[in-house]
């Protein structure tokens, strides 16, 4: 009797590539004519998975976010992996913007994905684990159909499919 096939649905970010994009962004800020004397800074806290942008004005912070976004895209990081807060007033008339790197699938999103897969009426079993989902079925074709379906959906964060067996 054939064993069930399965795969995991995860949301992970390669922090080394994020760090590389961050380094490229700081280099561009220090060299770009319109940004180098503005006093704008960007910091990355790897432990908290947090970007902190300090800028003299809101439009400068948006320019830095655009630079960082272009560097992240070139490094293969989906922009949905970074959740930006609204700009906040900081000391000295500056603006601070925080960007959180989103990893793992939270329970609400996992339940929504589970419901969407169940609504497809495929013979698959979905198990919600801590920060990922395991989808299993006797039919590999059903698993491929689920992968194609999930790629077409938008859950506000990037999804990867790993551990395909």
Regions found by a protein language model. Give the residues of each.
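Short edge beta-strands and adjacent turn/loop segments
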Residues: 36-47
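N-terminal, positively charged regions that mediate nucleic acid binding
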Residues: 1-37
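Short glycine/threonine-rich beta-strand-turn micro-motifs
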Residues: 45-58, 129-139
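Short amphipathic alpha-helix segments
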Residues: 19-34, 68-69, 106-118
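Short, hydrophobic beta-strand segments
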Residues: 5-11, 48-55, 92-101
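Short, conserved charged micro-motifs
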Residues: 17-18, 59-64, 105-109, 142-143
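Helix-adjacent hinge/juxtasegments
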Residues: 60-98
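Positively charged, low-complexity, intrinsically disordered RNA-binding extensions
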Residues: 2-3, 7, 96-165
